[in-house]
């Protein structure tokens, strides 16, 4: 069961909360009529236990059990610093 854990990579937008970060996940979707690829952004709250992230960092997050009303993702690693 633990081999199906979803992981995503995104950019940190905010680290103003204690032990929490806001991560922007970008994906490309194709317009149904015109075929142009458009960028769509999803904002996800993730748990950052050591408060090690800063705004602009590229991070990897993974899905976990719900930690609060809006947090169900946790930080795995900081890929690159801002």
Swiss-Prot record:
GO biological process: translation
Record protein name field: Small ribosomal subunit protein uS17
InterPro entries cross-referenced by the UniProt entry: NA-bd_OB-fold, Ribosomal_uS17, Ribosomal_uS17_bact/chlr, Ribosomal_uS17_CS
Xref: Gene3D superfamilies: Nucleic acid-binding proteins (2.40.50.140)
A Pfam family recorded for this sequence: Ribosomal_S17
Biological role stated in the UniProt entry: One of the primary rRNA binding proteins, it binds specifically to the 5'-end of 16S ribosomal RNA.
Subunit structure of this chain's protein: Part of the 30S ribosomal subunit.
Keywords from the UniProt entry: Ribonucleoprotein, Ribosomal protein, RNA-binding, rRNA-binding
Similarity-based family: Belongs to the universal ribosomal protein uS17 family.
SUPFAM superfamilies: Nucleic acid-binding proteins (SSF50249)
């Amino acid at each position: 069961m633990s081999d199906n854990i979803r992981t995503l990579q995104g950019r940190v937008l905010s680290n103003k909360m204690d032990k929490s970060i806001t991560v922007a996940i970008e994906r490309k979707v194709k317009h149904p009529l015109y075929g142009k690829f458009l960028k769509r952004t999803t904002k996800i709250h993730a748990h950052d236990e050591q408060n090690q992230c800063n705004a602009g960092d590229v991070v990897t997050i993974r899905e976990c059990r719900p930690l609060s009303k809006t947090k169900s993702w946790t930080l795995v690693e900081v890929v690159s610093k801002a």
